[in-house]
Structure formats: C-alpha cells, structure tokens
C-alpha cells in the first residue's frame, strides 16, 4: 500500500508505530485475551495504563507537582464552559483575548456564565493578519482569569509568547492544537486544556492541567463531569472515561518519549514549518496571508493565485497520497496541518507536489 500522509486538522494523523502496536494488541491486550476496549476502567490493568499515561504526560511537559492532570470528556468546547464554571468563583467577569475563530467560540460560550471583557487582539500589518503582542493586551482589574488560544487552527495564527502578567492573573489557555509540539512553562498558567484529537491521540479525550489552588471553586450549577474537583477526587473516573482514547494517548506519550520528547518535536516541527512556508514564500503561485511573527507551525493555510485550480489541486494531491488538504470553509483555499505525528518526509512529499503542480499549471 502506498504511503498516505493525512494533513487533517483533527482527528489528525497518528504515529504509524502507535497504530501498529494498537493493531497488534487490539484483540488480545496484555495477554488477557480481550481488547483494552473491553476491560473495566477500574480494573488494575487499566489503572496501570491511566497512571503511566499521566506520569509520561507530566514528564513530557515538566508539569509541576502543584498542578493536577485530569483526563476528561467534552473536548475543547466542553472546556469553554468548564473554565468559567470552575474558575470564576464569586467574580462575574473574565478577560478574553480574541485572536481567531476558536477564541471567539470560547467567548460565545463564556457569555452564558459571566460578562467577558473581550480584547480584540487581531490586527493587520502590511496587509497581513497578525496579533497584537501581549504587552498591548488590555486586561481588567476585577477579572477572575484571562483566557486565550495560543494556536488558531482555522486562521493559521499562533501566539508563541509566554504569558507574563504577574502572579495575580490566572491564565487559562486552549492548547488543543499545539500541546506537546514545543516546550511550555506550565507554571505561567492556571489552566491549560487540550482536546486529544490533534497532537495527543484519538477524539473523545480531553486533558486539563489545573493549578491545585484553583480547585474547589466550581459553580453550584456546574455539571459533575465538568467539575475539576470531582474529577480530581475520583482520579478522572467519576464516570466511565473514554478508555481506548486514554490507552492510545498513553502509547503516543511513550512514542514521544522514545523519540526525544517535546524538545525534539520542537526542532522537527520548526523544520517542517520552514520547509512548507519556504515553498509558499518563494512562489507567486501560492500565498499565505499571516504575518511571519504569528504564523502557526501546526496549521498552514495557503491559497492558490488562481482559485479555479483549487479543485484540481485537491484531486491530484489526494491521488498522490496527500489527504485532507482542503481549507476550512471559513477561509477557503488549502490547509496543511502538520502536527507531531506528521513526519518530515510527509511535508517534503507535499512541497515536492506543490512545486510540480506549479510547474504544470503556473
């Protein structure tokens, strides 16, 4: 079978080695004669899976001991509600920085629970889309927390700065599309959350990192399965968790550790991004309209100079084993999502195709 490279924004490509192991273990896991999908989440075998996954995840991100790691349902959209329901306490407002589609979605959900103070960080610089630097973000004095999204998958916009707003500002961040792709200083955040389906594992699992002093403040109306304290007190097993997604994510963590960890992923991701953006920038046939300082290394949107060729580009790229390159309906064009599991050879195959396509149709 020819090599297929999946550039989907999520559910996204998974490491081939991980899929092979899961395939081998699917019907007989750990010699039990059953699938990991069939064993009890409270049995000792799965408890070991859960504990190892948390330990490996903590090690990969150097999560401090005063932070809890929760394995949850609900995805990023679930956390759009969970953050205000857990962190507001007796306050009625929170700061939200709008830099793109997902930040705006979080703001829309937060309005059900508080009065967000919204700061529009979007700006145009020399005709290119960009984000104002953090030093220009206008935060309020009475906010329970400040929320932002470091990587906008649809817009292809990244905020790579490390937040430094002082110890009194609780920073909450949606890391769904950039978690584990580069080192981060977890201690600068109060809450970090990430849906698994981009850089962690299969859809269905959400990971939350929360500073322990923020627990115990949930709104009385907060659903139990979104209550950080209840999840923590029950080892993320207040209800039946998505066991297969948890297991497979644990395999991804071990794959990451075996391949140099987050620091090595950071280097490889930089190489992949430079290769792809290099082809775009050195061509009049392709374009990307994001300022270089805010370009995402995970999600690279690009347009063809002649949009009439879009359909042909997608058909021919798919036939060449380059799948899921169609851009989001909001922005159109193309989008290549190049998360950790996308090897450098996959990006090389894409750029070779782009150069050849331009030669034939430019």
Curated annotation (Swiss-Prot):
One of its GO terms (molecular function) is O-phospho-L-serine:2-oxoglutarate aminotransferase activity. It is found in: Cytoplasm. Its EC number is 2.6.1.52. GO terms for biological process: L-serine biosynthetic process; pyridoxine biosynthetic process. It comes from Escherichia coli O139:H28 (strain E24377A / ETEC). Keywords: Amino-acid biosynthesis, Aminotransferase, Cytoplasm, Pyridoxal phosphate, Pyridoxine biosynthesis, Serine biosynthesis, Transferase. It comes from the Bacteria. The lineage of its organism: Bacteria, Pseudomonadati, Pseudomonadota, Gammaproteobacteria, Enterobacterales. Transmembrane segments: none annotated. This is Phosphoserine aminotransferase. Its cofactor is pyridoxal 5'-phosphate. Signal peptide: none annotated. L-glutamate binds at residues 9, 42. NCBIfam families: PRK05355.1, serC_1. It is an enzyme of class 2 (transferase).
């Amino acid at each position: 079978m020819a090599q297929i490279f999946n550039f989907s924004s999520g559910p996204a490509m998974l490491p081939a080695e991980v899929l092979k192991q899961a395939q081998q273990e699917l019907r007989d896991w750990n010699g039990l004669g059953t699938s990991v999908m069939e064993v009890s989440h409270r049995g000792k075998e799965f408890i070991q899976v859960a504990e190892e996954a948390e330990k490996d995840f903590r090690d990969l991100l150097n999560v401090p001991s005063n932070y809890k790691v929760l394995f949850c349902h609900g995805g990023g959209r679930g956390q759009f509600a969970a953050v205000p329901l857990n962190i507001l306490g007796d306050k009625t407002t929170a700061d939200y920085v709008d830099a793109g589609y997902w930040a705006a979605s979080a703001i829309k959900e937060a309005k059900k629970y508080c009065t967000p103070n919204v700061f529009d960080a979007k700006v145009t610089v020399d005709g290119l889309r960009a984000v104002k630097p953090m030093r220009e973000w206008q935060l309020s004095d009475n906010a329970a927390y400040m929320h932002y999204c470091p990587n906008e998958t649809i817009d292809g916009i990244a905020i790579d700065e490390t937040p430094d707003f002082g110890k009194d500002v609780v920073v909450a961040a949606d890391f769904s599309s950039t978690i584990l792709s580069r080192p981060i200083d977890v201690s600068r955040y109060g809450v970090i959350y990430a849906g698994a389906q981009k850089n962690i594992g299969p859809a269905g699992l959400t990971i939350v990192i929360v500073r322990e002093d923020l627990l115990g403040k949930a709104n009385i109306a907060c659903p139990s399965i979104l209550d950080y304290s209840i999840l923590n007190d029950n080892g993320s097993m207040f209800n039946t968790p998505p066991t297969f997604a948890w297991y497979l994510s644990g395999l991804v963590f071990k794959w990451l550790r075996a391949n140099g960890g987050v620091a090595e992923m950071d280097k490889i991701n930089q190489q992949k991004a430079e290769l792809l953006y290099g082809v775009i920038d050195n061509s009049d046939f392709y374009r990307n309209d994001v300022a270089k300082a805010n370009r995402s290394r995970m999600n690279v949107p690009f347009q063809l100079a002649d949009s009439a060729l879009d359909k042909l580009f997608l058909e021919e790229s798919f036939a060449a084993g380059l799948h899921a390159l169609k851009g989001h309906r909001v922005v159109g064009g193309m989008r290549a999502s190049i998360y950790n599991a996308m090897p450098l050879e996959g990006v090389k195959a894409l750029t070779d195709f782009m150069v050849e396509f331009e030669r034939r149709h430019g």
